[in-house]
């Protein structure tokens, strides 16, 4: 068990993979000072909040992750979905367009953008 705690992000990912989201959230919060500028950590924490249906708390993690690594399509897609949960259609459209600038053949973003622009 010592090995997992030598690699705290690995332990955090394992908790998420095992579906222990509440425990992962608590453990992740304890790592925040050490990993506050790590885009992978920020993505994981935002993802946990998103899974726990707290898009409002997920958003700052996604935003900071994208400030550090602005070409991360996975983070942009989760941020898009968080905007949708928060009923922020225009922000979701902006995210879809950013995804398509990075990956013009991203069918998920393309389909979602078409749907959002037609409503």
Where are these regions (language model features)?
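Helix-start (N-cap) detector for alpha-helical repeat units in TPR-like alpha-solenoids
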Residues: 4-5, 39-40, 73-74, 107-108
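Register position in tetratricopeptide repeats
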Residues: 17-18, 51-52, 85, 115-119
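Conserved structural position within tetratricopeptide repeats
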Residues: 29-33, 63-67, 100-101
């Amino acid at each position: 068990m010592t090995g997992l705690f030598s690699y705290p992000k690995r332990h955090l990912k394992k908790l998420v993979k095992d579906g222990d989201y509440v425990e992962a959230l608590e453990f992740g919060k304890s790592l925040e000072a050490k990993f506050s500028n790590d885009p992978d950590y920020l993505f994981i924490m935002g993802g946990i909040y998103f899974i726990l249906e707290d898009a409002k708390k997920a958003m700052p993690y996604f935003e900071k992750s994208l400030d550090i690594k602005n070409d991360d399509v996975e983070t942009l897609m989760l941020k898009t979905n968080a905007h949708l949960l928060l009923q922020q259609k225009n922000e979701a459209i902006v995210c879809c367009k950013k995804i398509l600038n990075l990956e013009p053949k991203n069918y998920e973003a393309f389909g979602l953008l078409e749907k959002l622009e037609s409503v």
